[in-house]
């Protein structure tokens, strides 16, 4: 198997950063080569034998070559050697153009040489010749939005923020900046923007609901037969503070109030693009109040 994952996402995985959609690779004797190389790199120290293992795998697998390049770039397991890191990346771009993103990062940050934003922009743009590399697309969007290493191109930035949004948290903020500057969108782009907005809000609300569920457990306010609480958050364009109302009660007013309090400081991170006749928008969020985990609920459903 020589399936190539997004190289910037691979770097984020190695460093422990969160990126939506990243594979969660775990160390095991039966790992696929890409996963094996990443798991070795994530170790606090790398043995000489493991270095040789990665060196061998790097001759066959692009991502293992990138890992070896990162080892030289950061001096992890081997002596730091920027030319070797750059050489490894350059040797792989013919097999996978997304590796250009590593060369872009080196040029942008002045690794192994002076900062060169013109070269960084060129490398990043080369890295997104094939779609599906969200982190690299986000970098291109930033360079185009702010005119780094070349002329400003807001429509180009819009294109790449829209394509990177499923994998990068900051894309929605970039889209909001472009909207505030009056950048126009096609009907299809508006629909895509609204999908991104809804996905982001649902993700944030799900995390908020999980936090509230933990609070209920800690304060012993859960009961096995308690009903879920559903709230509605209604927004008005230009006003980030939602109007929050109770849609479904748990049957316990104290629990309901605790849930409502948990949403009290929530703010919409952006706003959707509404048709002229629509003045408000809303979304619902549900908090489980039975004190069970998702696995426990699933097991109960299976046993029925």
Annotate each language-model stretch with its function.
Residues 17-67:
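N-terminal leader/linker segments that initiate helical-solenoid repeat arrays
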Residues 40, 65-74, 100-109, 123, ...:
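Hydrophobic face of amphipathic alpha-helices that form TPR/SEL1-like repeat modules
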Residues 152-169:
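TPR/TPR-like (Sel1-like) alpha-helical repeat modules
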Residues 43, 60-61, 72-78, 95, ...:
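Glycine-centered coil turns and helix-coil junctions that link the paired helices
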Residues 52-55, 89, 124, 161:
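Hydrophobic/aromatic packing residues within the alpha-helices of TPR/SEL1-like helical repeat arrays
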Residues 172-180, 188-192, 210-214, 236, ...:
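Conserved "boundary/linchpin" sites in short secondary-structure elements
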Residues 112-115, 149-152, 179-206:
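Alpha-helical linker/edge segments of TPR/alpha-solenoid repeat scaffolds
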